[in-house]
């Protein structure tokens, strides 16, 4: 089975193109003083490409993953002097694995419905567990430490929190619910995608998160250094993800 990162791009009608173009031009006219030169460049670039109506091939999950890793590597080639080697490795590994959870059948049913619905006709009625949560419980602490000799036990918590919360989703699923969901819709698929036998998920990783996005989890004091590392990983991960999703190869 082929796994996809997002839905096929919608081709706009001429009327829709004209409407979006007018709205973006009005935005520039009314709020030009509020934008940076980079912001204006992006908006004008989007306007100029609205007429590009040729349908693009649907991006596979592997292609999207490779694009984000490449974006991170290009960024560090230019700005790497401002980061430690460990920081760069942490960000690149987060880019590599943050979307693994998209291999789950429910997500694939949304972005690749024809292929999935041939086998699962009721796929649209099943509630999806957010893909970031699944990604973060697919790797163990020991597997993480083997990714780089630079990684320590202390790095696991900020790293896994950045992957788990790379999108802001309500955090209402506990380990038994995730395991049950994965047994039906994820374990087989992630094993196929990664070309390795994923025998179990590591839902105990939830206990290592710096925070849970819900109203009932207990909060414990966290060292400022851990928060700083988490913010660095998540901030750059989101930066590169948004850059690639917008169609750019390089982040500024």
Region annotations inferred by a language model:
Residues 3-12, 25, 31-32, 41-57, ...:
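Accessory nucleic-acid engagement/destabilization modules that flank
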């Amino acid at each position: 089975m082929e796994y996809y990162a997002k839905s096929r791009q919608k081709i706009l009608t001429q009327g829709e193109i004209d409407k979006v173009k007018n709205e973006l031009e009005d935005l520039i006219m009314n709020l030009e003083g509020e934008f940076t030169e980079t912001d204006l460049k992006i908006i004008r670039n989007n306007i100029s490409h609205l007429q590009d109506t040729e349908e693009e091939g649907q991006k596979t999950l592997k292609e999207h993953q490779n694009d984000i890793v490449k974006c991170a590597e290009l960024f560090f080639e230019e700005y790497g002097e401002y980061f430690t080697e460990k920081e760069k490795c942490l960000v690149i590994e987060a880019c590599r694995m943050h979307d693994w959870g998209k291999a789950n059948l429910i997500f694939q049913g949304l972005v690749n419905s024809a292929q999935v619905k041939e086998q699962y006709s009721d796929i649209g009625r099943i509630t999806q567990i957010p893909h970031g949560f699944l990604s973060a419980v697919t790797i163990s602490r020991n597997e993480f430490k083997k990714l780089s000799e630079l990684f320590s036990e202390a790095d696991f918590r900020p790293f896994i929190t950045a992957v788990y919360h790379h999108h802001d989703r309500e955090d209402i699923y506990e380990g038994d619910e995730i395991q049950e969901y994965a047994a039906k819709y994820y374990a087989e698929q992630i094993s196929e995608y990664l070309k390795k036998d994923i025998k179990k998920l590591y839902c105990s990783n939830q206990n290592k998160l710096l925070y849970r996005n819900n109203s009932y989890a207990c909060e414990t004091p966290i060292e400022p250094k851990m928060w700083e590392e988490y913010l660095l990983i998540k901030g750059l991960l989101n930066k590169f993800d948004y850059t690639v999703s917008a169609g750019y190869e390089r982040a500024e």
